[in-house]
Amino acid sequence: MAEKQQAVTEFYNNTSPRGAWEFLLGDHLHEGFYDPGTTATISGSQAAAARMIDEALRFANIYDDPSKKPKNMLDIGCGVGGTCVHVAKQYGIQCKGITLSPEEVKCAQGIAKAQGLEEKVSFDVGDALNLPYKDGTFDLVLTIECIEHVQDKEKFIREMIRVAAPGAPIVILSYAHRNLSPSAESLKPDEKKVLKKICDNLALSCLCSSADFVRWLTQLPAEDIKTADWTQNTSPFFPLLMKETFTWKGFTSLLMKGGWTAIKELLALRMMSKAADDGLLKFVAITCRKSK
């Protein structure tokens, strides 16, 4: 477990703080949300990444209504703080982010300070499987493209539920593999091989299915569980990624700021694009509320 955590920490220490993908995503370390069939553009990529956050909150019925919106939020796997900064600015919610990477925390603190949000946003170094917060601390618990790095996803979700206040919404955005057919016990060997290559290059532990997420949540104090397949909403990102990273600006940004780690990430993202086209890889949204 410690070895896996160290690999994830080094992965993000080596890529995100130095901005290997900054030219494409800005302060966000996740894909954007697009209308299906849209042609993604470099000029709109950062707005699409911010829209992903807004769509996640909308999916969880978070309203910009002072009487209904959460007072505070926890972002697990916060990266360089883009989600926390966006939510604090757009919704006025007090935000806390947590990540394994000390370098990401330093970068996130700098971004929050530059936005004048030191009083609204803060960041901790910590483990998602052992969150350093009391039970029922947060009115909203969110994670975007983080749980893929964790082997024990059920424990990750238990921790999300634990630190959520009664009735608080919980939101998970994650890559996942396709759901199995009723007669299948596992993915096909060639599918497993593809996913292993992707996971190895991105410091991911493994991928599960959206059905797995639902199964784990039904065993916990969670209600109003719902899922959505957003694969078509993220797929426009991949052609843009391939186009822009092979420009001089894109390639030098990857090579100079991210080095070999970022190049491996690019290769994995190319495999992800094909796996999504083949129906093997999905981008899923899951939300629920902690039972009162």
From Swiss-Prot:
Tissue specificity of this protein: Mainly expressed in mature roots and, to a lesser extent, in leaves, stems and flowers.
Domain of life: Eukaryota
Residue span of motif Vacuolar targeting signal: 135-141
Temperature profile: Optimum temperature is 30 degrees Celsius.
Region span, SAM motif I: 71-80
Any single GO CC term annotated in Swiss-Prot or TrEMBL for this entry: cytoplasm
Region SAM motif III, residue ranges: 161-170
pH-activity dependence text: Optimum pH is 7.5.
PROSITE patterns, per the entry: SAM_GTMT
Gene Ontology molecular function: S-adenosylmethionine-dependent methyltransferase activity
Keyword entries, A-Z: Alkaloid metabolism, Membrane, Methyltransferase, S-adenosyl-L-methionine, Transferase, Vacuole
Region (SAM motif II): 134-142
Xref: Pfam families: Methyltransf_11
Family recorded in the similarity comment: Belongs to the class I-like SAM-binding methyltransferase superfamily. gTMT family.
Assembly and binders: Homodimer.
Protein's name according to its UniProt entry: Norajmaline N-methyltransferase
Annotated organism of origin: Rauvolfia serpentina (Serpentine wood)
